[in-house]
Structures are given as C-alpha cells and as structure tokens.
C-alpha cells in the first residue's frame, strides 16, 4: 500500500487536500473550545498525516503535534513543508511512543484508506494505547451514499484539473484519479477506500473502550457534508 501513496505524494497537495485539512482543523478547534472549554488539548498525534498540513495548522495554533504516515514520500514532503515538526514513517497500526496524547486525529477519510478490516481494528487498538485517559480520537469518514459515482472534472485553476470516477469492488470503493496540467496527463492511479459505516466503526471503537461523543456532517460551521465528522472519547482507565 505504501508504494501507491509514495506515488500519490507527487500530486497529493494539488488535489485540494490542504484546503480541507485547514477547514477540518478550524472546525475541530471550535468544537474543543465549545464542548471541552476546561480541558487541555495541547498534545496531538496526527495519524495517516499525508503531507502534514493539519500538523502545520496545529503548530500555528500553539499545539505540540507529531505526524505519522506509512508513506516515506508523503513524510518527505511533510518534512520539507514543516521542518520544525516531527514526522515519522510507520504503519500506524504498529506505531509506538513513550508519550501519550490529548487527542489523535485522522482526517480526510484517511482511516478508510486502510482497506483491510483487521488492520483497521489494530489501528484502533493502537490509538487507545497512545491516548491519555479521556483523550479524544477525532476523524472523518466518507459518506458514500452522498457521493456521486459519475465521472467528474474538477478544475483546480486555469491550467490544472482532476478527473475522477468511483466504482465499487466488494467492500471497497475505488477512485480512478487522473491529474492534468494544460491538458497533459501527468498522473493516474487507482485509490481504494473501505466502505465502512459510522455504526460499524463505532462498534469497533466501543470494543476498545471508546464512546461516541459527536457525529456531525457539519462540524461547527465547516460544511463538507459528504463526510461524517466523528469524535470518540476514550473512557477513563
């Protein structure tokens, strides 16, 4: 899997992930301020961090953050963008640390890119180990019931565009993604996601000692309604 994302790193930031990561971060901080005004959330671990945009946002807002991703090329881009943030290349289901964290994030439907359900369960178990008591796991899921499976063209600016189309392969959804500059095809690949429901994910997290604290399509005024924004709380040890 890391080979695919090493290749994806070439165009990852061109696909609009930066904008969504910033919106997710802003909505998340509003949530913490309003729902947990008396708690400290100053240590973050961002798993499946990609090119590190969310980590950069956290640092700019006074939060100590670290990013982990299985793709070495993604981590290289993250390190070049944010040289003063620690990034680690590692399978997030196996990552270990001497520290625990106030909250762990996994944005832009990154958990669904772990396409083996057993690996998803291992990742959740590991998140539990890495969180402090009463810490939060904050993530999002694609709601494929609201996403078109028709071929789509997305203009990024006057010269750059994406063409992508989805189809189902058993429990997976495949994105065929093409990236063009000046009508020249520069990158094409298939990206797979696990089609998992909120109920299914919540059951897995309940099994590891989490409770669902919030489930929203808007996440405090950030209106990417095709994704579920989810907050799970680790129960006190």
Predicted regions, residues:
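Conserved S-adenosyl-L-methionine
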Residues: 190-194, 211-220
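Class I SAM-dependent methyltransferase SAM/SAH-binding core
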Residues: 52-94
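A short glycine-rich, Lys/Arg-flanked "PGG" loop and its adjoining helix->strand segment in the class I
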Residues: 121-133
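A short acidic, Gly/Pro-enriched loop at the edge of an enzyme's catalytic core
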Residues: 96-103
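Conserved class I S-adenosyl-L-methionine
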Residues: 1-48
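SAM-dependent methyltransferase
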Residues: 138-204
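Core SAM-dependent methyltransferase catalytic element
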Residues: 221-237
